[in-house]
Amino acid sequence: MNYVPELKKYYKDSVIKELVKEFEYKSIMQVPKLEKIVVSIGVGEAVRNKKLLDSAVLELAQITGQKAVKTKAKKAIAGFKIRQGQEIGAKVTLRGNSMYEFLYKLIHLALPRVKDFRGINGDAFDGNGNYSFGISEQIIFSEIDYDKIERISGLNVTIVTTASNDKESKALLLKFGMPFSN
């Protein structure tokens, strides 16, 4: 028997039924589901110190369990001394089982470790059912050893769903246990 993450099992067993009842879908295929989660780090100082970018790639790989890809500047910005095509960040796109594992770890282990945590903003949806938020410190993840990091940096997390609007997407994430403050 293949391994199925706890959150994926919960989605199939409970969340689908609850959302069908709540939004009165005609078919279970209309129920929104998670498509992917993109975790990224922007490292502006990578212009001067390449070691910081390598450190960010390593940290993302430790946090997500998947190899990170370096991202490049789309256009030159003279004020930041950035040239087009210069590597200035890293990202990981999670799908399938690793996506559900990361979401479980984020909701139940990492976010509760944030100092004075009162929930995340529930209004950061993009109008198409996708949700993005920032994490100010990567050290909330247990995989990161505080003594071995170059510097404390933040992460961007984007959760892409198949929901057609923000209301359905928020309901889906609430069923997964996302701690919204509003």
UniProtKB/Swiss-Prot annotation:
Domain of life: Bacteria
Record-linked InterPro entries: Ribosomal_uL5, Ribosomal_uL5_bac-type, Ribosomal_uL5_C, Ribosomal_uL5_CS, Ribosomal_uL5_dom_sf, Ribosomal_uL5_N
Entries under Pfam families matching the protein: Ribosomal_L5, Ribosomal_L5_C
Disulfide bonds: none
Entry keywords, A to Z: Ribonucleoprotein, Ribosomal protein, RNA-binding, rRNA-binding, tRNA-binding
SUPFAM superfamilies linked: RL5-like
Single GO term (MF): tRNA binding
One BP term from GO: translation
Metal-binding listed as a keyword: no
GO CC annotations, alphabetized: ribonucleoprotein complex; ribosome
The protein's assembly and partners: Part of the 50S ribosomal subunit; part of the 5S rRNA/L5/L18/L25 subcomplex. Contacts the 5S rRNA and the P site tRNA. Forms a bridge to the 30S subunit in the 70S ribosome.
Family assignment from sequence similarity: Belongs to the universal ribosomal protein uL5 family.
Purpose of the protein: This is one of the proteins that bind and probably mediate the attachment of the 5S RNA into the large ribosomal subunit, where it forms part of the central protuberance. In the 70S ribosome it contacts protein S13 of the 30S subunit (bridge B1b), connecting the 2 subunits; this bridge is implicated in subunit movement. Contacts the P site tRNA; the 5S rRNA and some of its associated proteins might help stabilize positioning of ribosome-bound tRNAs.
Protein name: Large ribosomal subunit protein uL5
Organism: Borreliella afzelii (strain PKo) (Borrelia afzelii)
Gene: rplE
